[in-house]
Amino acid sequence: CPVENSIYMSQHRFDVLLRKLEKVKEKAKYMKADDLHGLLTCHEADAMVLCCEMQLRAASMRKESRGWFIREDYPDMDNENWLKWIIVQNKEGEMTFHTERVPVEEYDVQPPKY
């Protein structure tokens, strides 16, 4: 696996992947289906591209490392600023992102303090 596709993330890698994804989205506009099975495959491909974009943009938004989520440019866990959920929504056809505080007091298991 090339290092640029490893589990280690950085803003530069996110930007490169998002540019590649834009090219895929452009090509996907020209998909065609000859039958119902092909149409289903086209819809699945569109859904995969959408999921990939949501995941990349949300990951790019998180400016910390946490558990398996390892960012080279933000190597430390930051509970003060990033003990949050990232919420992705469709608002009037646009992908939007915001964060919500994780209500840790409601859970028996607490995040580590570093």
Question: Can you describe what each PLM-predicted range is?
Answer:
Residues 1-114:
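Glycine- and aromatic-enriched mobile tails/lids
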